[in-house]
């Protein structure tokens, strides 16, 4: 019965994702009636006469790539957050724990200061993000202490270092041309999405997400502790490394697409566990759809509520803090 309920939940979340995507095609500063949205979609599959050329252009060249990006980023941040929380046995862990977001921000800020193209900004962000994680992983090995706690402390050290570098880059950046771009990128947005680059990033994200879902039962074992997992036949160091690499790649790719979008990787796994339970085999697939739905909603809101687009991080931060206040209030008797 529980498996049947879980299947119903996943099917419902998948259908809700499709419904939100359809609604997002019509909603925005340029409102498009839903019958026109349906006409454009039907025409793309060879049915009907389509809609006016300007409507078709907005849907096919602007909104569809952006909606796909929102789904990918939301799902990636959510499932990587769930993986990190399982591996590190801490439900307050987020995908930027090991410094990938801070490192990516340094890379993007460097590229912006040197006036490089959007493609190079994304390449710098991805490369610096992975470099930051590599430094985080190297510190415990250099010190001969590879415990989970040491890894977390190394992530804090590297994130602090990257934060200082970001502060320096913002200090030396041109306040008229470069600084606003750096700040806006830090807050997260899909406004400058390059659909051509998305074609190369999306397969990496999908493969990493599939690997994490396939290893969800191993994450269950790792969450029992290193000694217990080893007694059950788990190669703790290897499998933890694979999970961290996949989750880091997902986070790095997400940051390349949208900049830094906070709270998604922390908030959505909590909601998924509240919905389907703490078993990662169930909560991780649910978190993928919930992350996609959440960022679809936030992005649609960001491009609809004002003339100038609101950064995603502003909205996710507001929603995230309200949610955790509600969680604290809900659990006040337990506390």
Where does each model-flagged region fall?
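Alpha-helical transmembrane segments in inner-membrane proteins
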Residues: 1-335
């Amino acid at each position: 019965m529980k498996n049947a309920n879980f299947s119903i939940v996943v099917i419902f979340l998948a259908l809700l994702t499709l419904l939100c995507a359809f609604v997002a095609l019509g909603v925005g500063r340029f409102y498009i009636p839903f019958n026109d949205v349906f006409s454009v979609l039907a025409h793309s599959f060879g049915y009907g006469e389509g809609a006016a050329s300007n409507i078709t252009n907005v849907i096919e060249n602007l909104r569809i790539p952006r909606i796909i990006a929102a789904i990918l980023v939301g799902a990636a941040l959510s499932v990587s957050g769930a993986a990190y929380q399982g591996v590190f046995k801490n439900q307050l862990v987020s995908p930027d724990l090991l410094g990938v977001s801070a490192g990516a921000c340094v890379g993007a800020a460097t590229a912006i200061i040197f006036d490089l193209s959007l493609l190079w900004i994304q390449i710098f962000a991805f490369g610096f993000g992975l470099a930051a994680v590599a430094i985080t992983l190297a510190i415990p090995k250099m010190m001969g202490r590879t415990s989970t706690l040491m890894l977390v402390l190394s992530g804090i050290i590297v994130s602090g270092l990257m934060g200082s570098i970001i502060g320096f880059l913002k200090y030396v950046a041109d306040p008229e041309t470069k600084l606003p771009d750096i700040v806006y990128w830090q807050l997260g947005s899909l406004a400058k999405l390059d659909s051509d680059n998305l074609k190369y990033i999306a397969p990496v994200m999908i493969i990493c997400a599939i690997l994490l879902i396939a290893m969800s039962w191993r994450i269950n074992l790792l969450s029992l502790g290193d000694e217990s997992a080893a007694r059950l036949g788990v190669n703790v160091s290897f499998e933890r490394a694979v999970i961290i690499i996949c989750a880091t790649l997902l986070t790095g790719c997400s940051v390349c697409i949208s900049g830094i979008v906070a709270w998604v990787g922390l908030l959505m796994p909590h909601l998924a566990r509240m919905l389907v339970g703490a078993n990662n085999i169930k909560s991780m697939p649910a978190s993928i759809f919930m992350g996609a739905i959440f960022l679809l909603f936030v992005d649609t809101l960001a491009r609809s509520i004002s003339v100038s687009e609101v950064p995603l991080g502003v909205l996710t931060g507001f929603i995230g803090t309200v949610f955790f206040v509600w969680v604290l209030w809900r659990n006040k008797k337990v506390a």
